Structure formats: structure tokens, C-alpha cells
């Protein structure tokens, strides 16, 4: 006991010594972030509490086989097959049936291609099929919707009587690419009419419409969709009890797995001693884990979630160091040290920065150790290259702030799409996921793809829209809003409109690669798509001020039960 007390005392003295070496005469642009809303909550999820029983595993496999049978035995030519696939995807269990769904959608697409002239006037079926087929990366022409328009290209008013048809047309529009004017028209038409009819709908349909208008299926995070749709689905009179039982049990088992991982990561975070070593930074361990789960939620991605969470934690602290605490003169040697990525650089940086630098070094050591097991240690090179780009871009922002520079929009975006860290996270996702990726595919993603820069632009502009007011309450570098206002002598509102226009176009770039970059496996594109979805669901600056929507979402995924034993 005496030894432990001595060790703790030594640790406290060391921390005090590090912090006491900060020049207190320097004025620092402190952001005054709120403390974590979760603190050590997830430490309570012990291995015993999160253990998955052999009975649960057995029951899951039995139910999965029955759902698989249901999926295989339903004819690919039937409307029921489309509805079943859509339901399985929304309920979050499609990952169990990837191959079956892939084969079915291929058959459905082939059948459509052979019978294009067949007269199908059911908007619900046409729109649902369009969304599911494009969702599996088959290019189905948007001309399928021409039959629902008048000679002037406007959608027929008679369609307003078909709520499910309108809802599915609305959902389909979010898979549009550049130049699809009919889908632009469809989006405007469906939003207008769904909003006006929503108050008159029955509770179940009203819930679906309300949720869709807030967040369409395609741009939503699949793991977030699942618990919300489970609650909607069990209130649909025609729901399938067996399917409902399966999805609830699957959600429950995955939730236990995520709780255990959160508990382990909370211990790691506690050992980092945030409040003493990084008091200037956001305390966002749980939110970082949510981000990682939004990219990869399946049981096979435990390592990926751990490594991505740690990376986002390090990026968050580093971002706050550059953005809300350190001086420019302190940041120059720190940037050089990160580029060197070696222990000998430790003496060149301010003492209070050294704990973070050590965590940074430890992270890349851990990555190298993990990838060596897979024979993929050479992948670490790509992560280090992206980290160097990121850290240099942080310094560029600090330089702009120091010199009161508001750059032109294009110059701002070139730098800011790096500082949003989307590319760093994306490349790390691909590195740690455990899949084989060729050098050519890495090079394509980094240098040639539309999807990677589009995803970064969405993240940057959405972050600037939702975080702008908070950031301008303190000394902070210019966002896209300030750059646009200055360059074009525009209002803030006009800047927001332009940012949203560019976000919409970036989604079309994502969809273009998703549909047409057929040489690239889906698992390579999926993380970029999911990273875009993660930021798209945020309504305010939820990552920084995570006491509202994001807190409720995290609770929904990692705390609340879906009653796995009570199945309708």
C-alpha cells in the first residue's frame, strides 16, 4: 500500500513539474470545453456483465439460419424480396447475409435490364428497386422515373396520394450523381409533399416520414438506423416475429461486445491522465469510440475499432493543442518532432507536450506491432504520410491565425480538408481493418479517387456550418464562412447556402465513385461513405458539445436495451 501511495505521489509531482514549466504569462485562446458527460461510466461494464453466453450464441445462429432461409426462399422476382432486403438492411443485420443479398440484387438488376420496356407503374416498387440496386453499386438509370412525370418534366400531382411511393422516391434521390435533373426535381417534389402530409398520417407512417426527413437512409449511419427502425418495425402490424427476435438478439450481443470494448478503452484513457496532462483538450473518449463504431460495427472489427478510437483521441488532443492552447513558437518544434516520429525528438519540444508526443509514438509502435502479425507492417508508411500532412496543415492554420490571415476559399479548403483529419482516419481504417489492399488501391484512394476528397469536404464544410458560432466566441482561425464572406462580400447566410451546395455536390462525387469505380472493392469505399454519414447526422456541434443529440445517440447504441428477450 505504501509503495502504491509513493508511486501515485511521484506521478502527481511529475505532472505538476510538467505543467509548471508552461509559461503562465502567455495568453492562450482557451476554449473552455465542458467535461465528459460519460466520465468513467463504462468502467462498470465488467467482463462478467458483458459476457455473451453460449445459449445466446446458439440461439443467434439458429435464428440466423431461419432468416437466411426466408431470404433465399423468397423469389427475386417478387416485391416481397425487395421489401425483405430493405427491412433486413434497416434493422442492421444485413452484414450476416452479404452474399445472399448481393446475389439477389444482381438477379433483380439483370431481370430489369432484360425487361426494360415492361410497364411498371408502381412508384413504390420502382423507387425501392432503384435504391437497393444502386446501393449494391449497379448503375440503374434515373430514367426509370420519367414515366411518373408530365411533359414539362414535373412529377404528376396524382403521386401525392401514394405516401409510401413518395417516401421511397425521396430516399432514392440521395443516390443521385451529377447531371440527374430528374432526381433533383424528385427531391424537391417529395420533400414539399411529405412535409405537408406528415401531420395527417397514422403514427407508424408518420414516424417513418419524420425520421426520413431528418435523416435519409442512405446518408444515415447504419448502426444508428438499426435501433430506431427496430422500434418502428415492431409497431408495424405485418412485422415478422422471427425476424424481430433475431435482430433484437443480434443488437443485444453486439451491444455487449461494444460495452466491453468501451470499458477497456476507458481504462486506457484513464491511464492517459487527461485532466492533468491535457486539461486544454476535449475529453471525448466515448464520442471517439462512437465514431469508430460508425465506420465498423461488426464483430470482426474489434481491432479496427480500438485503433481508430485511439487515433481519433490523439487527433482530438492534437487539434486542441494547435487550435486552443499552444503558441506558434511551441508548435513549430512539435510539428518537426511529429514528422521525425522518433524518441530522440522528445527534448526538442516543450515539457508539457511530451506526454502527448509519447502517446503518439506509442500509437505507431502499436500499429506496427499489430500489422506485423498480419505481414502488413509496410502499411504503416501510409498512416505516417497522412499524419505528416495533417500536422503541417495544423501549423498552417496556426500561422494564418498568428498573422490574422483570412485566405481565399479555395486555399482554405485545400488546407482545411486535411485538418478535418478525415483522410488520416480513412487511411487508418483501411490499414487496420484486416483486409488485403494492394499498393495500387492505396495510391488510387489517396491520389485519384473522388470519394476521399469528397468525404473530407463534407466533413470540413459540415463542421464549419455547425461549429462556426461556437468557434468565433474565442480567438480562432477563419472557417469557410469567414473566407466566403470576405472573398465574395457575402452574408453569413449566403456562405451557409454555398457550403450546403458544395456538400450536396460532394455527395454526388461519392456516389459517382461508388457506382463507377468498379475496380475498387466495396470494403475500400465503405469507410469513406460511413465517415461522411457520421458527420451528416450531426445537427449541431455535437462532437464538441456532446450533451444533446450525440449523448442520446450514444445512449441508444451502448446503454439502452432493445429487449432482446421480449420480441413483439
UniProtKB/Swiss-Prot annotation:
GO terms for molecular function: magnesium ion binding; terpene synthase activity. Its EC number is 4.2.3.59, 4.2.3.40, 4.2.3.-. The keyword Lyase applies. A motif (DDXXD motif) lies at residues 319-323. Its cofactor is Mg(2+); Mn(2+). Mostly expressed in roots, to a lower extent in flowers and, at low levels, in fruits. Transmembrane segments: none annotated. Keywords: Lyase, Magnesium, Metal-binding. Pathway: Secondary metabolite biosynthesis; terpenoid biosynthesis. Mg(2+) 3 binds at residues 463, 471. Gene3D superfamilies: Farnesyl Diphosphate Synthase, Terpene synthase, N-terminal domain. Mg(2+) 1 binds at residues 319, 323. It catalyses: (2Z,6Z)-farnesyl diphosphate = (E)-alpha-bisabolene + diphosphate; (2Z,6Z)-farnesyl diphosphate = beta-bisabolene + diphosphate; (2E,6E)-farnesyl diphosphate = beta-bisabolene + diphosphate; (2E,6E)-farnesyl diphosphate = (Z)-gamma-bisabolene + diphosphate. Binds 3 Mg(2+) or Mn(2+) ions per subunit. Mg(2+) 2 binds at residues 319, 323. GO terms for biological process: diterpenoid biosynthetic process; terpenoid biosynthetic process. Belongs to the terpene synthase family. Tpsa subfamily. The Asp-Asp-Xaa-Xaa-Asp/Glu (DDXXD/E) motif is important for the catalytic activity, presumably through binding to Mg(2+). Sesquiterpene synthase involved in the biosynthesis of volatile compounds. Mediates the conversion of (2E,6E)-farnesyl diphosphate ((EE)-FPP) into beta-bisabolene, and of (2Z,6Z)-farnesyl diphosphate ((ZZ)-FPP) into alpha-bisabolene, but also smaller amounts of (Z)-gamma-bisabolene, (E)-gamma-bisabolene and nerolidol. This is Sesquiterpene synthase 14. It comes from Solanum lycopersicum (Tomato). The gene is TPS14.
